[in-house]
Amino acid sequence: MFSGSDTMLTAHKRRVLAKAVLCAALALAAWTLSPGAGLAQDRQPNIVLIVADDAGYADLGSFGSEISTPNIDALASVGVRFTQFSVSATCSPSRSMMLTGTDSHIAGLGNMAEFMAPNQKGKPGYEGYLNDRVVTVSTLLKDAGYNTYMAGKWHMGEEPRHWPVARGFTRDQTLIPGGGSHLEDMWGLKGERQLYTLNGKAVQTLRPGFHSSEDYSSAIINNIEENRTDGKPFFAYLAFQAPHDPFQLPSEWLNKYRGRYDRGYDVIRAERIERMKRLGILAPDSTVYPRLSNVPAWSALSDEARRKSARQMELYAAMVEHMDANIGKLIEYLKAKSLYDNTLIIFLSDNGPEGNAWNVGSPWDNSRFEDWGKKGTFIQYGAAWAQVSAGPFRLFKGFVSEGGIRAPLIVAGHGTRGSGRISNAVAHVMDIPATILSAAGVPHPGTYNGNNVAPSQGKSLAPVLDNSLVSVRGPSDWLGWELFGNRAIRQDKWKLLWLCEPHGAGNWQLYDLDADPGETNDLSSAQPKVREQLLAHWAEYAASNNVVLPDSSPTCAKAN
């Protein structure tokens, strides 16, 4: 994120905004300099960072879903929900920014390692792993005396020198690659054996009855308990695989949502959007991106197609609730051990829902409908239900439209004031490290181990969390995105979006996100000065972050 003067404004508006920005700056300075503001006072807080994998913006009860998520919703009821929080369009770029506060094109994940284009390979920022030009929040907290624990999905480098223990975590139970089975078979997408580590060592087997959501949450609890009386605060990073496909569940969860989605995706999506409006997550007149042209109306499907589609969503919903139950297990533990009140808890999703279908083969076997959701099956839900998960937004994971990059963020506990608040502040995943370090009273250094490291590009959300300010960004601040050749710039309410064909127009389009969160009305012709201003910001973003547009892309008919 970079800032600049907003030349789109009239002279009078600039003078008015200058006064407003000055007042905000003075308030922020006063907040920053006041004794203990946003920082640890007598005791440094514990910090829990919880990440859902591929959960959509509209998949939580507190964001309008019919899926039962009582534990996440309880955090929302005592904390702050952010309605305009953005991430990258896929997992590893988001995670690199979430742990470093630095743009993914600097941190080494300018593209996912799996989709690195030939012209990107070997370029700085495109290593395909978390590089040494950045320092992780876990490293800084560890050096500041924190116990640091991780459990779950890593996806930021597969060599031992890239594993969590090399990036500041003292204990871990980790799936190193980007996905695979949730069960003990350790299968990857093509049935290959996936790499897991335990405290920095590769493991050969997982326990019988292993399930990712249950075992990762238990690992965090066990690590906290083992060192609970040593006097140190802890940073716990719980990186769920759920609800990422394949949808697999313990037997008692398989029929949790049986029959709940028989009315189909058109009805469920409309109901979610209405609930979002009632909750204040969406404005009453918010636009909605229409059902994708390649998705038939539910009423047009055959009975068999409806049966299968509804079952896919039943399993997905159960995955979300099962994850929530295991979050509840952790929160219950924190309360039972009198740790909850001094803990900052952050929950987010790493990107939009997965609407792209994977081609999987042997040994995965989906031939028996009654076995769906069990070991050996790889169930996905496709674009239609992904649109339900994304709510009113356009597209889903893999795209820098709002459906791919708008994610739920809930922050509760230490340093938050005003139970159940909804914040419309523009926030970004790069803000997470700055917020954590502010809470812990730990500065971000310019050097580490004698080497220069990239500065944090995020902003601490602490002034919003403690209700000192409504936003940490002014009208001249802007944010940039690029992934797979798709690109975007956002400044205040304006977003300039390039989506390649066949999913987009293959040129720049301008949207007013306040009036049009569904990105349905291109205002490029009506607002040429705004368009040119944001194009200039795009050029600055690309140059400052060493963006290399790919010559091949998994989402584009033709790249660049």
PLM feature spans:
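Bacterial N-terminal signal peptides that target proteins for export
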Residues: 5-24, 31
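Intrinsic low-complexity/disordered segments
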Residues: 9, 38-41
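Formylglycine-dependent sulfatase
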Residues: 21-25, 40-508, 515-543, 547-560
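C-terminal segment of classical bacterial N-terminal signal peptides
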Residues: 28-37
